[in-house]
Amino acid sequence: MSKVRINDLARELEVKSKAILDALADCGVTEKKTHSSSLEADEAVRVRAHFARGSRGAGQGGSRQQNEPKPKIDWSRVSKPGDVLKAIQERNEQETVAAARPAAVPVAPKAPVSAPPAARPSAPRPAVTAAPPPVAARPAGVQPGSQPAVSVQHGAEAQKPAPRRIVPQPRQPSAVVAPPPAATPAIAARPPAAPVAVKPPVTTAPIAQQEKPAAPAAQEVKSALATGPSVPVAVSPSVVVAAAPPPATAFQAPAAPAAPAASQSAPQEAKTPAAEAPPVAPEKPAVPAPPQRRVIMPQTGPRPVYTAPPPSASPVTPRPSGGGIQRGKPIFDRRPTGNSPGGPGGPGGGYGQRPSGPGGRRPMHPTRNQPGGGPPGGRPGFNNGPRPGFGQRPGGFGQRPGMGAPGLVPPPGDTPGRPQRPGAGQKRGGRSNQYPKSKEGPMKGFAPPSRFGGAQIPTEPLPITRTITVTEGISVKDLAEKLGVRGKDLIATLLMRGVFVTVNQSLDGELVKDVARQFGADTTVISFEDQMANEAFENLLSQENPDELELSRPPVVTVMGHVDHGKTSLLDAIRETDVAGGEAGGITQHIGAYKVRINKEDSPAFGREIVFLDTPGHEAFTRMRARGAKVTDIVVIVVAADDGVMPQTLEAVDHAKAANVPIIVAVNKIDKPEAQPDRVKKQLGDRGLVPEDWGGSTVFVDVSAKKRQNLDLLLEMICLVADLGNLKATPGRSAVGTVIEAKLDRGRGAVASVLVQNGTLRAQDSFIVGNTFGKIRAMFDDRGRAIEEAGPSTPVEILGLENMPDAGDTFLVVADRDKAKGIAQYRQMKEREVQLAKSSRVSLEGLAEQIKQAGMKELPLILKGDVTGSVEVLADSLQKMSTEKVRIKVIHSGVGAITESDVLLASASNAIIIGFNVKPDRKSADLAEQENVEIRLHTIIYELQEEITKAMLGLLDPVFKESYLGRAEVLNVFKIPKIGTIAGCRVLDGVLRRDSEIRLMRGGEQVFKGKLTSLKRFKDDAKEVTNGMECGVGLNTSDIQVGDTVEAFTMERVAAELTAQ
């Protein structure tokens, strides 16, 4: 026996597989089954019967409001919405006429009426005869929900009365009486039929129900007018009379065995030929239609199922009719029969049994002219014209499985104007374009993902509505968090731009700006150093306590100026003033900052302190400003009165203005006879620094460092400008400062000079500075004395660093060492990301630059210095010396003596070690001699630059220049055995030399290039032949012709140049 899978049976019964598994025990199946198990044929029959009983029981009892079906509309008879309104108006007019007529005399019916069979064959319904009019009310004892549908047959005559149907409508309170039906119309080939005559209505007698079998879920009724579409009418549950004439070729499916007469009359009526009379339009009565109750069109109902009349020879047992969808019942069994509601040709009906012999037309799409198979013919029960009504119900159905022949299924998009109800993207019958089958088991509800993973990718740039701040080398994940989008959306956007990245990959600044603009955000890219400075200041602000006392602090002054303008002399003079005031003199300054105390009693600034920074010029000041650390409070610009304003002076002024720092101009060397202080004031006034005595706001002080003139006035003016700035600090908070200089001491390790800007720094404090951390083991002031704490504006030298910090890094005291270590590790990771971002992505421009640099010479260097400031300045200045032909590459730079590791690195990379104010130890020098590593030691930067320039020139290839000598014309060609071809020439200009190179030209093209093998004047060898003389020239070629030109030249080596010409 054939088996049926539980999944297939569940789809057939339109239930879940779990429901079938739960019902197996009730059906006598004790073996354990799963969703993919199979059932025997007899077991499947029992399961179908079980669900059929359950659906009928649910339809009659229980939740009546939920399971009771709604009345249906025969969509096959509605072509447009106007037909519905027309049918309603005609129906109302007919009802009005019927209500005005007198009651007709009841007559006996002409033919027995077959009632629809019950679900079980053992309990058939008896045949019911229809009583003649007038209209009779329904007995109160009969419930509408259990009243069966009854159809009336009167014969096959052309003028037979229309059948009567009892329409159950349980939820309508008012009673409606239908007008008398029209006679059976004659049917033409295609157009719909029209009524010919009208007969009095027929009243159906109440039916005595002997047994109450399990009826279908609901009885749905549709009335089909001969002149229009079928319209549902609100009726009363007690008195309802509906009239609907069947078509001329009406037929009836065979009734139950209890009514054999009715089953035999159906095929006879089906064979009645259609009359050839043209369709007649019905007359519309002049009686106005009274207002009727609003008609509600239901949107649910079964799919229309078409059938053909069964052959008369072998009647088929009819199946129970049912217009509504019965859940749990197989979808293939919904083929109502009989000329009753739900039967073929009737209102709301579908297909009957398909005929076994040749007959009616096979089902076809409404837009097709001919079906795919079967001979053309009239389809019983349907018009051959265009299908009236509303067309397909919203969300329509696909082709019925197993129905039709090849060519019956319309192609996709062939049916115009088929609306879809929400959520009905799937068609029945397996005809669907997108995932027609519902999956069971673990793959239930699965649908393939959309393109780009469902990413919402903006196709056009959004308007700029916000601003974000990112660091260099930000990862894709961090950028997505700042933009508020998903990481895969950002990756998809980059993919559309041709950039392939992962979620952890770093991005460069320009790409970040472009992508953020696509998502409606303006981007500010800051460096890693700026981020660390911002974090430090945020921590500073977060730790501020309004209850803490703010005190005035000493100003921090930076002295800047052009070379040889007396900057160093002025600082020495100020220091001498401090020493003359009683301080110990001759103190060697180990750090670049020191304090000066004003001890002149008659001075207004007596007892005040000023901190001077001895920084390496404007270069270090620019770096501090770029890192966001405003170390300097006041800038003193030193200008020589005899020399005037120089370019470096203007550059220092620009840096001070960019840092928004007050400027004091010290006009030095006023003791010289050629001094012109007014010229200096005019030059600086043109740059925006207008003196106070000229109506400006810039303080000008005329000083002489050599004679120590007006130095006290300069210090007093510095204190006055500081008071205007209201410089305050909070000594009670944790210390915050800036690294001025850092160096590596052999005995003490890493040493940093720090200027405390706020708070108080104490010994044993844990701190974070840049990307390193540490704990203060010892602290010294500017005079080398060990101290325990340092207040605001105090320069100190600290020990206890784990690594070397950079000049300008922010110094911040934290709670404990572990926290400082975590912050340092995080900053080191971010710094690595920045470096990777600069080197990982290779664009087309970068690739072209690499190809261009492939032919460049490279000079690798290892740079070691005494302090970090010197190393930074040297590294920048040396790299700026790179040209298009030679590029300087600093492999490693550091602070301290030259070590063995430096020598090994230089040996591996063929680099030169440059030592600035440092020397190698004995082991390092021996290793360098063994490895043939060159070490160059310097103390002056200018000498270092000159030596590097010579090394760069030595790397260039030798350059040769062609020098023209003379030209001769070939007059004759001689071929001498054992010697070769000799050209007899006359020198046209210049000279031909025996050691020169020649070029043989013919017609402006070079034929041969080489050296002269011989040069003779007649029979004698000659060293050279001058202009106008004839000679014999021997060449290492035989391709010589009369009229060729011999050009003589030499190649000279010239000095190479670093820049391209």
Swiss-Prot record:
What ranges does the record list as Pro residues composition bias?
279-291
Q: Spans of biased composition, class Gly residues?
A: 340-360, 392-405
Q: Which residues bind GTP?
A: 561-568, 614-618, 668-671
The record ties this protein, via SUPFAM superfamilies, to: Initiation factor IF2/eIF5b, domain 3, P-loop containing nucleoside triphosphate hydrolases, Translation proteins
Which regions are flagged for Low complexity bias?
97-113, 120-130, 167-177, 184-199, 250-278, 381-391
Renumbered to this chain, region (G4) spans 668-671
UniProt keyword list? Cytoplasm, GTP-binding, Initiation factor, Nucleotide-binding, Protein biosynthesis
Locate the region Disordered: 51-199, 250-460
One Pfam family matching this protein: EF-G_D2
Q: Where is this region: G5?
A: 704-706
Using the UniProt annotation, give all residue ranges assigned to the region (G1): 561-568
Provide ranges: composition bias, Basic and acidic residues. Answer: 67-77
Q: Where in the cell is it found?
A: Cytoplasm
Q: Where is the tr-type G domain?
A: 552-728
Q: What is its main location?
A: cytoplasm
User: Which Gene Ontology CC terms are recorded?
Assistant: cytosol
Q: Which GO terms describe its molecular function?
A: GTP binding; GTPase activity; translation initiation factor activity
Residue ranges of region G3? 614-617
Which residues lie within the region annotated G2?
586-590
Alphabetized PANTHER family for the sequence:
TR-TYPE G DOMAIN-CONTAINING PROTEIN, TRANSLATION INITIATION FACTOR IF-2-RELATED
Family to which this protein belongs: Belongs to the TRAFAC class translation factor GTPase superfamily. Classic translation factor GTPase family. IF-2 subfamily.
- HAMAP family referenced in this protein's UniProt entry, alphabetically: IF_2_B
Task performed by this protein? One of the essential components for the initiation of protein synthesis. Protects formylmethionyl-tRNA from spontaneous hydrolysis and promotes its binding to the 30S ribosomal subunits. Also involved in the hydrolysis of GTP during the formation of the 70S ribosomal complex.
Name by which UniProt lists this protein: Translation initiation factor IF-2
Instruction: Give me the gene this protein comes from.
Output: infB
